[in-house]
């Protein structure tokens, strides 16, 4: 028998007689691994159990999220196991911690079904988060290669086409969520939509938990909403819309509601993140065929995205949802009532809007990534914002965003229409100041007060909400060490 064959036989014999061996020695750790352009890369924050070596913990995550089980198996010999094993290739300590590590893992692209987020996530987050070798585990970022991205459709509409359809350019979109979320009759619900749109908003929307309850069935809501939309469009001469939430118990029911919304003229429908990845992709495919904008509410995301040491960072959800094909996703406000560190939110927005991502540790972006011409997904800022913050919102979030003022419209002391007008005037005055080259951030309060001198609804809103803000320390902030650089 040739010597090389004897050597391979000896190695395999030792491997498969060993029963249980460390993951790092099973082939799931390779510090010299050469990355391929087609590799799917994942960055995990790992908190190993006491006594577990960080490299072994990283190898365990690589193994359990790809091909490994708790013992060696002979059937590995029937596969190209050396290729299909995920490879942990780098482990770095997390700055400012003593027990957390960033583990970089590469996956062969052929491990995943084309165009299936459900299959991708079944491996990456499917089983490994319950693994005993790690005390806590968080998926911080991913690089999806060009070749794999090309198997996904991306956003059904995209920001450019949405602006063309709605004839709205040079400023953020304006919207509001109908309040109260639950309990209104269909007729009163439609009245809220009409008044908000007539006052100057582009969109009204359902909230995440309004579906088809005893106090208002879905078809009743859809009809009254569209009556409000059509009347407001006729009165203002502008294209208007209302996000009709088609979320339901089954995908079949969702298709029924989507088709009905389309039939009665809605330009946009809405779904919730909690319906699951397969349902989201299914509705995105429908939306593209029907030429309907698809809005996604991130309902439920904070159950796994908010805690710093365990779960999934929201930037990963942003990437996945852009792949799935949604046109809008709630992505933070910075200044509102919901979690949102400014740098982290910037990273979320860039993941949704840029055509090519560069490594930016301050924004939590750990990989370069080309979006393979997938359309842009519009971020939505919603939750505890009002017109007095307009200069901050424009500065932090830019133009390609939907600013949604729910309480900040419907809570206006003079009514819904006045609340909408206050927001529209505040936005247009701030955009004008920016376009004139003024320091709209520093002069923001003065710009708003000057605009309010000729707009009663804006003055009433500023007097009511003044400088209300939700100033809490974010639980999720970037982990990086600033390094001074000198000029040459």
UniProtKB/Swiss-Prot annotation:
Modified residue annotations for N6-carboxylysine? 205
Q: How is the cofactor bound?
A: Binds 1 Mg(2+) ion per subunit.
Q: Which CDD domains does its entry note?
A: RuBisCO_large_I
Instruction: Kindly name one Pfam family recorded for this protein.
Output: RuBisCO_large_N
Of the GO CC terms on this record, one is: chloroplast
Reaction it catalyzes: 2 (2R)-3-phosphoglycerate + 2 H(+) = D-ribulose 1,5-bisphosphate + CO2 + H2O; D-ribulose 1,5-bisphosphate + O2 = 2-phosphoglycolate + (2R)-3-phosphoglycerate + 2 H(+)
Subunit record text: Heterohexadecamer of 8 large chains and 8 small chains.
Keywords linked to the UniProt accession: Calvin cycle, Carbon dioxide fixation, Chloroplast, Lyase, Magnesium, Metal-binding, Monooxygenase, Oxidoreductase, Photorespiration, Photosynthesis, Plastid
Starting at the broadest rank, the lineage of the source organism is:
Eukaryota, Sar, Stramenopiles, Ochrophyta, PX clade
Residues annotated as site: Transition state stabilizer: 337
Superkingdom to which the source organism belongs: Eukaryota
Give the main EC class: lyase
What name appears for this protein in its UniProt entry?
Ribulose bisphosphate carboxylase large chain
**Which positions are annotated as binding Mg(2+)?**
205, 207-208
Q: Could you tell me where this protein is found in the cell?
A: Plastid, Chloroplast
């Amino acid at each position: 028998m040739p010597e090389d064959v004897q050597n391979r036989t000896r190695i395999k014999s030792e491997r498969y007689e060993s029963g249980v061996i460390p993951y790092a020695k099973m082939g799931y750790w390779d510090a010299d691994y050469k990355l391929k352009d087609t590799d799917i890369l994942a960055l995990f924050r790992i908190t190993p159990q006491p006594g577990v070596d960080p490299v072994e913990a990283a190898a365990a995550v690589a193994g359990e999220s790809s091909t490994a089980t708790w013992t060696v198996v002979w059937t590995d010999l029937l596969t190209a196991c050396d290729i299909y094993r995920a490879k942990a290739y780098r482990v770095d300590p997390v700055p400012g911690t003593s027990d957390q590590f960033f583990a970089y893992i590469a996956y062969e692209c052929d491990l995943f079904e084309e165009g299936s987020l459900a299959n991708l996530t079944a491996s990456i987050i499917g089983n490994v988060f319950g693994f005993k070798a790690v005390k806590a585990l968080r998926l911080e970022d991913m690089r999806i290669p060009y070749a794999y991205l090309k198997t996904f459709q991306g956003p059904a509409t995209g920001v450019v086409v949405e602006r063309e359809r709605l004839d709205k350019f040079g400023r953020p979109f304006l919207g509001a969520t109908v309040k109260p979320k639950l309990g209104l009759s269909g007729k009163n619900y439609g009245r809220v939509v009409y008044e908000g749109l007539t006052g100057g908003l582009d969109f009204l929307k359902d909230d995440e938990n309004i579906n088809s309850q005893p106090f208002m069935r879905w078809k009743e809501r859809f009809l009254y909403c569209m009556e409000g939309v059509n009347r407001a469009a006729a009165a203002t001469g502008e294209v208007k819309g209302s996000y009709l939430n088609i979320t339901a118990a089954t995908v079949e029911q969702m298709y029924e509601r989507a088709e009905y919304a389309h039939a009665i003229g809605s330009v946009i429908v809405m779904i919730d993140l909690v319906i699951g990845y397969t349902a989201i992709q299914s509705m995105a495919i429908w939306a593209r065929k029907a030429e309907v904008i698809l809005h996604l509410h991130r309902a439920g995301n904070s159950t796994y995205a908010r805690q710093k040491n365990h779960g999934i960072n929201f930037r990963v959800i942003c990437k996945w949802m852009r792949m799935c094909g949604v046109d809008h996703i709630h992505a933070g406000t910075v200044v509102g009532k919901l979690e949102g560190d400014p740098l982290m939110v910037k990273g979320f927005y860039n993941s949704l809007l840029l055509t090519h991502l560069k490594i930016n540790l301050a924004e939590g972006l750990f990989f370069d990534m080309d979006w393979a011409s997938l359309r842009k997904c519009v971020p939505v800022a919603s939750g505890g914002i009002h017109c007095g913050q307009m200069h901050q919102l424009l500065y932090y979030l830019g133009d390609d965003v939907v600013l949604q003022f729910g309480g900040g419209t419907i809570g206006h002391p003079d009514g819904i229409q006045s609340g909408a007008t206050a927001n529209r005037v505040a936005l247009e005055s701030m955009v004008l100041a920016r376009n004139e080259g003024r320091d709209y951030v520093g002069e923001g309060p003065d710009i708003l007060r000057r605009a309010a001198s000729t707009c009663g609804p804006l003055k009433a809103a500023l007097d009511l909400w003044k400088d209300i803000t939700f100033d809490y320390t974010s639980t999720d902030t970037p982990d990086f060490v600033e390094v001074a650089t000198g000029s040459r």
